[in-house]
From Swiss-Prot:
Subcellular location: Cytoplasm
Family annotation (NCBIfam families): PRK03902.1
Record-annotated disulphide pairs: none
Protein name in UniProt: HTH-type transcriptional regulator MntR
Length: 142
């Protein structure tokens, strides 16, 4: 079972490896705005829990278990960003909102949000209809 903090690290490590081909402690620390010693401590825990293999001074690699979870965490994050965009959340608020909610939703809720995103994306008229409702509500609330 992963904690929200473990998920943040696994997600960031997965993204760094996808982007650069590797993830160093210093890269992870910079991306998460934490001290390198905190990264080392968490990486050792993730190694112990078999999410990654860490060798001091040699770097780290995700295990198949770590890759699977990392991929799912990135999917969750991107899906929630899509969802908030569809429902009209201001772009500059989306990242922080996703960070605030992503660890508090069950995977069942994430799957249902995925269904809703697909529903809207399957027919752009649905998004237009939503925008009309939002516009009408804004006018009524003024």
């Amino acid at each position: 079972m992963t904690t929200p903090s473990m998920e943040d690290y696994i997600e960031q490590i997965y993204m760094l490896i996808e982007e650069k081909g590797y993830a160093r402690v210093s890269d992870i620390a910079e991306a998460l705005a934490v001290h390198p010693s905190s990264v080392t401590k968490m990486v050792q825990k993730l190694d112990k829990d078999e999410y990654l293999i860490y060798e001091k001074y040699r770097g780290l690699v995700l295990t198949p278990k770590g890759k699977k979870i990392g991929k799912r965490l990135v999917y969750r994050h991107e899906l929630l960003e899509q969802f908030l965009r569809i429902i009209g959340v201001d772009e500059e608020k989306i990242y922080d909102d996703v960070e605030g909610i992503e660890h508090h939703l069950s995977w069942n809720s994430i799957d249902r949000i995925g269904d809703l995103v697909q529903y809207f994306e399957d027919d752009s008229k649905r998004i237009d209809d939503l925008r009309s409702v939002q516009k009408r509500n804004e006018q009524e609330n003024q």
